[in-house]
Amino acid sequence: MKQILGAVALAVVATSAGAQVGHLPQNSPYRDVETNQEFTFFGGHYSAGGDVLGVTPRGGPMFGIRYEKHLGGPAFLMARWSHVNSERNAIDPTKAGAAAQLGRKNVSLNLYDLNLALNLTGQKSFHHIVPIINLGVGVASCGCTVKPDPYKFGTPFAFSFGGGLRYVPGGRFQLRVDWNDYLYQLKYPTQYYSNTTGTGTAAPSGQARSFWKNNGALTIGASLLFFQ
């Protein structure tokens, strides 16, 4: 995947360079981006992948911070922390029917990831716009414990990938919009598969204990840019 992203980035940069031929510097739609670091505050919405019981964290408002450092060429190293104000359904698998439903509870979901990000126009903007893509890894964590529900979110490993647009008007500030997908594994506790009530199990027959889910995020951010 990284090789593919790199090839796409090189192709776009080459096309961008060719498109500047025939333009005087002051008339070119391309402008050098002379900053090498950025610190971004962002907010948006997290769309969590659902599960059949609804006990895993749901989507909700999202906010966080991102730091990027120029590595060379079109490449940046990006570190990000995101927080989601989420909620989930809680159940008591030792009870049956309505008595098993503990209601919807507020929970906090946190995402930490480290990415390789590529500016598709290199260290230049096109009409003040810089398209970007990113690919990385991280972990997720959640304060999801609700007694007597045995479900635990844990700290699953996560893949992250996405893209976005930077608006760079000049100076030390920019705006950006980003879409990102977080792919991580969820697991149900063994208690969901025990027929302790004599009326069946909490998890439906044939439901896998562990499964992967894609979780999308759309955010808008404001950045402070730094010179090297």
Residue ranges with predicted function:
Residues K2-A7:
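Sec-dependent signal peptide recognition
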Residues A19-H70, C142-C144, L218-Q228:
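Short glycine/proline- and aromatic-enriched beta-strand/turn motifs that initiate or cap beta-hairpins
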Residues P29, D51-V55, Y67, A100-R104, ...:
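Outer-membrane beta-barrel proteins
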Residues F39-H45, A79-H83, I133-V139, L165, ...:
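Transmembrane beta-barrel strands of outer-membrane/channel proteins
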